[in-house]
Amino acid sequence: MLTSYQLESPALSWGEDGAPHSNQFDDVYFDKESGLEETRHVFLKNNQLSGRWASLQKNAFVIAETGFGTGLNFLCAWQAFLTEAASDKQLHFISVEKYPMTKSMLTDALKMWPSISHLSQQLIDAYPEVCHGLHRIELEQGRIQLTLWFGEAEDGFAALDADVDAWFLDGFAPSKNPEMWSDNLFKHIHRLSHQGTTFSTFTAAGIVRRGLKNVGFDVRKVKGFGQKREMTVGELNSSTAPLSARMSQGQAWFNLRQDKTSEITKVLVVGAGLAGANTAYALAKQGIKVEVWEQGNCIAGGASGNPQGMLYPKLASQDTPVNRFYLSAYLHATRLYSSLDRHKQFWDACGLIQIPKNDKEAVRFQKLLDEKLYPEAILQASKDREGCLFLPLSGWVVLTQLCETLLSHENIHVCLNTKLESLSPIELDDKTFGWQARSKYQQAPLNDRQACFSHVVLCTANDTKALGVTPKTPDYPIRGQVSFMDIEKAKAACQTIGESADKIDFDKILCEFGYVSPSINGLLHFGSTYDLKDLDDRVREEGHKRNLAILESLLLLPKETFNSEDCGGRVSFRCAVPDYTPIVGPVQSEDVYQQAYSTLTKNAKWQSNEIAEPIKQLYINIGHGSRGLISTPLSGSYIASLITGTPSPLEQKVSHKLHPSRFIIRDLKRSQIL
């Protein structure tokens, strides 16, 4: 098990010419005189990328690389793709790096290539925190997608869910880095490839050639670059190509593979809250036309419509797939919000102070800091409050503005006052499957193509069960009341009891049993209540009193400093799940699963190779609870990857934890489905 998300940065020395040199491997990252030309020769030319991109029929081309280094290979591929591929095509570039450079190292290394500085600066600006795991970076308005794995190469490719078209087998010389070129690495390269997948590498070392031959690649030597005599290229032949790279490893019931014969014409996303807005946006960036149906009269009218939301990741002290999801989602969300709102109109990365609720939590906080599980850029000791944690990347968001911004993409059309009444599978033509959607408010005739969609994504939170098109999920509503108060009244209340009004002028989010955010538009927002089995949608005084108690505790003020009569509020209902993990992925047929995996009722450890296909082209994205600001952007990108068949932004073990079928499998193992 991983003991720390922190990673060792490379030990670098810099030559007189300014080129970086790896002290760990005693090797150079590139040749200053010919680095660009060598990359273009070895990787672009010898994978025949120019011709393949010019004639590309599918929507996206996928490259995977061993050894990100300075990102030079990626930058060259990015530059060439923009000029050689049609403007409606995407490039997905996947790379792994055991010793990732810091942003400052990357900046220094890439100064040497002024001809691509317009691209390298974009990479530097979007470059993630150096933290173990999978990171998705979007460039060129989503046309260029970079997926980085920071950690061991073998672990990264084992975690990956992708279908690779070309491999850049790079890294330091095999003689200086033999550990990377393991049998398992080659097996994963094979698993992630298909018939016609090519590779090229600067080396002609036997360990590399034998490893590729052993997993089914046709391998040959060709002329190397410049003074190098030989390099190696090859292609995966048809007899050894895997069935599908998207098949789940080990547990067939978490299979993600679907029949890809149906063209993506238009996607229906049901719900215009955080989940729906992020899903629609992720699809729209891939050039897909999206229609969003929202039963309310405004965008973000449910739990996603609170005036001010915060990013509060609740980082765990153990490495688990669920913690990996929230950590990756947290970093992804902060990058997205920063890119969407460069002028701080609805997003402020002000930081968050986490206050321990009790002595036990105080001990846990100190353990987190002592064991250095997380990089300091993500988690550190608070300098403002002793014994507290500080999350410098966190911040607050104006939720409605965020959702409106996401849904303003030119490929998205939003239909308000449009409640989904029914979904029926149809054949759009002789070969194409789709869905007929009917609305309670906009009854479309059967032959109206506007009501026909190739794919449907349900982002319907607590309304999902009522639709009757998904297996019964154990999600449930939790009532939440948030309160707000005029900032001047709050200051006056402090002064009345002899406290300084400065206590209200804090600049970071404070969290303990609840939260309070820095004021916005003259109002202080705080809360929130967690009310189980309570469906009352009225704002209640007792809710204000509970929230005021939270506020007074956070600000270190005496009880009853504030008056509930000075509060306004809002009630909404979170969609929660018993395992505190969202339900995201392809929708399953409960009957099909029961028939395929009924043996689990007798033997919970039974494994099957039988694939129970999900319901065609129907997906779900719900159950984000109170952490939707963190989890919905990455979940939306994940749904988009499933629909388009492009590389997943999630590790496979993480996607299993989100998989909608997990509750069917759980109940079968408990013999609760007979």
UniProtKB/Swiss-Prot annotation:
UniProt keyword Secreted, yes or no: no
SUPFAM superfamilies: FAD/NAD(P)-binding domain
FAD-dependent cmnm(5)s(2)U34 oxidoreductase as annotated region, ranges: 270-674
UniProtKB keywords: Cytoplasm, FAD, Flavoprotein, Methyltransferase, Multifunctional enzyme, Oxidoreductase, S-adenosyl-L-methionine, Transferase, tRNA processing
Major localization class: cytoplasm
Cell location: Cytoplasm
Pfam families listed in its UniProt record: DAO, Methyltransf_30
Function, as annotated: Catalyzes the last two steps in the biosynthesis of 5-methylaminomethyl-2-thiouridine (mnm(5)s(2)U) at the wobble position (U34) in tRNA. Catalyzes the FAD-dependent demodification of cmnm(5)s(2)U34 to nm(5)s(2)U34, followed by the transfer of a methyl group from S-adenosyl-L-methionine to nm(5)s(2)U34, to form mnm(5)s(2)U34.
NCBIfam families: MnmC_Cterm (TIGR03197), PRK01747.1-2 (NF002481), tRNA_MNMC2 (NF033855)
Protein name according to UniProt: tRNA 5-methylaminomethyl-2-thiouridine biosynthesis bifunctional protein MnmC
